[in-house]
Structures are given as structure tokens and as C-alpha cells.
């Protein structure tokens, strides 16, 4: 009996794990298919089936029995506590406190407990009340198949869905309908009665927390009113000034005030900076104005100096013009006095002899005798000219001499006239240098000695005269030390040449005084007498013999010079001859020479005035 009992127990123990494994496999396959049908990705972890505490105890007891039977220690492949959460463990511990101890139970009690657990597991889906479920699991009746596309779930064939009408293993941890949203499920779960009960509960809770909530509500209401008023104001402002502001919302009042204060501060700073700049500019402009006034005063002083110089220059020119006229009159009076004053022929011969012995031209010798100076003496200092009081005299004086300034400053070609050409250019018509020399009984210009008419300077070295203008500054004028010595030397030579011309005229006047018959010959020419040419020839021969005897120590060249002079100026009274044209020619030449000398003297005075004006500048 004992052996049969042990065999029966072994068969029962071997069948129990098989039954348990079969039921667990069916439950696992059903649970997996159901999860794949609903939400395989989202609810896979929450839908795990946890075993009941009775099942766990039964499995533990079966393991112990098998270990005792086979006397082998082996670890079970299945961990009964795997996946069990802490609340289940706490619940298990709580249940164990009410259950009897393991050792006190017999094998029959354990078998009975296992069978009851299996029966409960089989009857659990059938005995579940349908009132707690708001809707069935039939997906064909409750919602269309097209809604599955929105939830991106896998579509199962219809033949499988018909057989899958089992309830879920854990209703608490899974949603009834996975294709419905959470808010839809909540709305369907709460009936009007439940909502009414909830409302009453909330009202009771509100009464309990009434005072605090009222204060908070008041604050919230006031804040809402304040914000509503501000919104209304801003809306009105935006509507009224939408075009100006561009449709943007207005800033709050505090920000406006801050921005206005910042703008006022900026404006005040800008105004202060502008005022400082204006003050600086005023100071600078005041300094500049003082400097400009000083410059204006200096320019006025300079202009006044220039104007005074110009006025003085013009006055001197006017006085020079007047003095030139006086000199012309004085020259005429001097010539008349020379004509009236008789000259001795012996004095003339003595002068000629002295000039020959000293190798000095007769003109220079006469000048030396006149001035009482040595040949290389200094030029007589020139006296300052008196200035007229009124400037109106300038225009009156210039009426008679329109080319006064041009003749003084520059020639027509723009360059100063050379002394050699000055005489030839200013000669009157019908009068040449050869005629004058023939009239004086001297050689022609081609055969003259260079010592008698020297050319003391070269034409290439002639400096052009600098015209003066009132606007010319002092810095633009050439320094006096650079050009004045040469100019002074040139002017001295030019004055010497003019003096020679003047002395030539004086010499000619003396000759005319010596032989006054030439002056009275005008009437004789008008009524020529009847005299023979033979008597004239005889008288001329007598004069030549007397001169040769007086100048027996002279050279043949001097005698040749004096021969034509004696021929030109006979000693005795003129006799009637047959050559009246010759006498007319001599008279005309003398008149032209006198006019030329007067003109040259006037020009000399003008040049002298211009030179003095240039030196005083």
C-alpha cells in the first residue's frame, strides 16, 4: 500500500506541473494576441499577468516535494517573484499573516487549495459582472475598422478577430478600448448621476475652503478687471493711432515715463553740448574777427602807403613835366644868351689843342670846364622835386603829354632804349647824324673814333625797368643790392651821353655865336648879293693858312677836321655867290639840331624823374 501510494503521489506530482504549464501557455498566447490586437507597443509592459499568492504558495510547495523525492538540489527555471511589484509583495505578506503556517497544512489541504485556485482561474472571466464594463470588446460592433489607421496599429484578419472575444487578464491596468482617446473614455465612464455627486462633493469642499478662496477670488477678479480696463485702453489707443504707431501695441505707462525721462535727459545733454559748441565757435569767431580786423588794418595801412607812394610818384611826374617845360624855356634863353655872348676864336682853338693833347673829346672837356670836376668825378647830386598840393594837376599836365608815363618807364617795344639808339630814333625827319657832324665839321659816324663816342655797357646786360603798381607787395620787389649798382652805373653812363649831347648843342651854339652871319644870312638868302666865288675862295684860303700857322704843332688829322669848319663858317661877311641852296640847307640843319637838343633834354629830365621814383619806391 505504501508503494502504491508513493506511485500515485509521483504521478499526481508529475501531472500538476503539466496542467499548470498548459494553462500558463494558453494564457500567455491569449494575452499576447490580445495585446497585439490592442496596443502592442504602449501597453506591453503594463499588461503583464501576475500570479495570485495561492498559486505561488502551491508552486513553492510542489518544488519542495520534488526536491525531497529526488533528493537533488536544483534551481527552478521560473522565478515566481519575477515581475512582481512591491505592492504585491506587501499584499502577499499581509495575506500570509491571516493564513495558517505551511507546516501545519497537510498534503490533502494543499491539493484542495490548488484545485480551488485552478477552478477560480477558469471561472473568473465568466463570473465577471458585465455592469462594470461600459462596452464589450467586440470591435466590429463598437467602432469601424477605418479608425485603426489613425492609431497606426496592425490590422488583423477578420477570422482571428471573431475568436478573440475574451476579456483582458488585468482590467485595472489596461484601457477597454485602445482606439479611443483618454478624454473620450473619461466622458463615457462618468454618468450624469456620478457627475452630480462629484459636483456636490466639490461644493462641500468649496464651503470648507470658502474664506480663503473668496479672498483669492476677489483678488483675481480685481486683477482681471484691471487687466480688462488696460486692454480696453490699449485697444482704443491702438484703434485711434493705428496709422501713426503702425498697428503695434502701446507700451505701458511706466515704460513711457522712463522713455520720456531718458529722452529729456538726452535732449538736455544735446542742448548743453550744442551751447558749448556755440560758445566755442563764438570765442573762435571773436578771435578770428580780431585777427581779421588786424589784417584789415594792416592791409589798409599798406594800401594807404601804396596810395601815398603812387600819389607822390604821380606828383613827381607832374612836377617833372612842368620842370621839363621850364627847362625847355631855360634852354632857349640859354641859347639866346650864348648867341648874344661873344666867344673868342682863340679860346676855341685852345680848347681844341687841349683836347688833342689830353686825348679827351671836346665835349667832355667843355663839360669839365663847365662843372669844374675831374673826368671820373661823381655825378652832381640831384635835387628833390617839390610835389604839387592838388592831384588835379596830374590830369591837366598829362593833357599835353599823353605818352609821359610810357616814355619814362618803357619804350614801345617793352624794353629800355639803349643810349646809342636813343639819338637816332628821336631825330626829326630830314636830319641825320652825318648831317650834324658835317655841320660841325667832324667826321662821319663810320669813321669816328671809339674813344669819342664810347659804348660803356652791353645790350645783353640791360635789365628791363620794373613797372610799379599799387597792388605790388614789398616781397615781390627785387632787392636793391642785387640790381641797383649796375643800374646806377648804366644810368650814369646814359647821363654822361646825354650831357655830351647837351654839350654838343652848346658847342654848336658857340659856333653860331662866333659866326653870327649865319643867323643874319636868312635875309641874305632871301635877297642874295652879287659877289664872285673867287673872293670866297680867297678868304677861305687865308683862314686855312692862319689856322695852319697857329696849329703848326698839330697833326694832319686835326687840320683836316678844321678845314671843313673854316669852309662852313667864313670869317668875313658873306658875299654874293651862286650857291643859295647851300645856305638854306645849313640854316635848316641848325634849326633841326636845336629842336632835337631841346627834345633830348626834355626826355633826359623825364628819365631822371622816373629813375628817382624807382629809387624811392
Curated annotation (Swiss-Prot):
Residues with Phosphoserine modification: 174, 268, 432, 532, 555-556
Record's subunit section: Interacts with Secretogranin III/SCG3.
Propeptide residues per the UniProt entry: 28-30
Transmembrane segments: none
Compositionally biased residues, Basic and acidic residues: 92-105, 258-284
Gene: SCG2
BP-aspect Gene Ontology terms: angiogenesis; eosinophil chemotaxis
UniProt xrefs under Pfam families: Granin
Record's keyword terms, sorted: Calcium, Cleavage on pair of basic residues, Phosphoprotein, Secreted, Signal, Sulfation
Known function: Neuroendocrine protein of the granin family that regulates the biogenesis of secretory granules.
Broad class of the protein's primary localization: secreted
Gene Ontology terms for molecular function: chemoattractant activity; cytokine activity
PTM annotation (Sulfotyrosine): residues: 151
Extra remark: Binds calcium with a low-affinity.
Keyword Secreted part of the UniProt annotation: yes
UniProt-annotated stretches for the region Disordered: 68-105, 120-143, 258-290, 407-427, 551-582
GO cellular component: extracellular space; secretory granule
Name of the protein in question: Secretogranin-2
Signal sequence range: 1-27
Localization in the cell: Secreted
Amino acid at each position: 500500500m505504501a508503494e502504491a501510494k508513493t506511485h500515485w503521489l509521483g504521478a499526481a506530482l508529475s501531472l500538476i506541473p503539466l496542467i499548470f504549464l498548459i494553462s500558463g501557455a494558453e494564457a500567455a498566447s491569449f494575452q499576447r494576441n490580445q495585446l497585439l490586437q490592442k496596443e502592442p507597443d504602449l501597453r506591453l509592459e503594463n499588461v503583464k499577468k501576475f500570479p495570485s499568492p495561492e498559486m505561488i504558495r502551491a508552486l513553492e510547495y510542489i518544488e519542495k516535494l520534488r526536491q525531497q523525492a529526488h533528493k537533488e538540489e536544483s534551481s527552478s527555471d521560473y522565478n515566481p517573484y519575477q515581475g512582481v511589484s512591491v505592492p504585491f509583495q506587501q499584499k502577499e505578506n499581509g495575506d500570509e499573516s491571516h493564513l495558517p503556517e505551511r507546516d501545519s497544512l497537510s498534503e490533502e489541504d494543499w491539493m484542495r487549495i490548488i484545485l480551488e485556485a485552478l477552478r477560480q482561474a477558469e471561472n473568473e472571466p465568466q463570473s465577471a459582472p458585465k455592469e462594470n464594463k461600459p462596452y464589450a470588446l467586440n470591435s466590429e460592433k463598437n467602432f469601424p475598422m477605418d479608425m485603426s489607421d489613425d492609431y497606426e496599429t496592425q490590422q488583423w484578419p477578420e477570422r482571428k478577430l471573431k475568436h478573440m472575444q475574451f476579456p483582458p487578464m488585468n482590467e485595472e491596468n489596461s484601457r477597454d478600448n485602445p482606439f479611443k482617446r483618454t478624454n473620450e473614455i473619461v466622458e463615457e465612464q462618468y454618468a450624469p448621476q456620478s457627475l452630480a455627486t462629484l459636483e456636490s462633493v466639490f461644493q462641500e469642499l468649496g464651503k470648507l475652503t470658502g474664506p480663503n478662496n473668496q479672498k483669492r477670488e476677489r483678488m483675481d477678479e480685481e486683477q482681471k478687471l484691471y487687466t480688462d480696463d488696460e486692454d480696453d485702453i490699449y485697444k482704443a489707443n491702438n484703434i485711434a493711432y493705428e496709422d501713426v504707431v503702425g498697428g503695434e501695441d502701446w507700451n505701458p505707462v511706466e515704460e513711457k515715463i522712463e522713455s520720456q525721462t531718458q529722452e529729456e535727459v538726452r535732449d538736455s545733454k544735446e542742448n548743453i553740448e550744442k551751447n558749448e559748441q556755440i560758445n566755442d565757435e563764438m570765442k573762435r569767431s571773436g578771435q578770428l574777427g580780431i585777427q581779421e580786423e588786424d589784417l584789415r588794418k594792416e592791409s589798409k595801412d599798406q594800401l594807404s602807403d601804396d596810395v601815398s607812394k603812387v600819389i607822390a610818384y604821380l606828383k613827381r611826374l607832374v612836377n617833372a613835366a612842368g620842370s621839363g617845360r621850364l627847362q625847355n624855356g631855360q634852354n632857349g634863353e640859354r641859347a639866346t644868351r650864348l648867341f648874344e655872348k661873344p666867344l673868342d676864336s682863340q679860346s676855341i682853338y685852345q680848347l681844341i689843342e687841349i683836347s688833342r693833347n689830353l686825348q679827351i673829346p671836346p665835349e667832355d672837356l667843355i663839360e669839365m670846364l663847365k662843372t669844374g670836376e675831374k673826368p671820373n668825378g661823381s655825378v652832381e647830386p640831384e635835387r628833390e622835386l617839390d610835389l604839387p598840393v592838388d592831384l588835379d594837376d596830374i590830369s591837366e599836365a598829362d593833357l599835353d603829354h599823353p605818352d609821359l608815363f610810357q616814355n619814362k618807364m618803357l619804350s614801345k617795344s617793352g624794353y629800355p632804349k639803349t643810349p646809342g639808339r636813343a639819338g637816332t630814333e628821336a631825330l626829326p625827319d630830314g636830319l641825320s647824324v652825318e648831317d650834324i657832324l658835317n655841320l660841325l665839321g667832324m667826321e662821319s659816324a663810320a669813321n669816328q673814333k671809339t674813344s669819342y663816342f664810347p659804348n660803356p655797357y652791353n645790350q645783353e646786360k640791360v635789365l628791363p625797368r620794373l613797372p610799379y603798381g599799387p597792388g605790388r607787395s614789398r616781397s615781390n620787389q627785387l632787392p636793391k643790392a642785387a640790381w641797383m649798382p649796375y643800374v646806377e652805373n648804366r644810368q650814369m653812363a646814359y647821363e654822361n651821353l646825354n650831357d655830351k649831347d647837351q654839350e654838343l648843342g652848346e658847342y654848336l651854339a658857340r659856333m653860331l655865336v662866333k659866326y653870327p652871319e649865319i643867323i643874319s644870312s636868312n635875309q641874305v638868302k632871301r635877297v642874295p648879293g652879287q659877289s664872285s666865288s673867287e673872293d670866297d675862295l680867297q678868304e677861305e684860303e687865308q683862314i686855312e693858312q692862319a689856322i695852319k700857322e697857329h696849329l703848326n704843332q698839330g697833326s694832319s688829322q686835326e687840320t683836316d677836321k678844321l678845314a671843313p669848319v673854316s669852309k662852313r663858317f667864313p670869317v668875313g661877311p658873306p658875299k654874293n655867290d651862286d650857291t643859295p641852296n647851300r645856305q638854306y640847307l645849313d640854316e635848316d640843319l641848325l634849326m633841326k639840331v636845336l629842336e632835337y637838343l631841346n627834345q633830348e633834354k626834355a626826355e633826359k629830365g623825364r628819365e631822371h624823374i622816373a629813375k628817382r621814383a624807382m629809387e624811392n619806391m
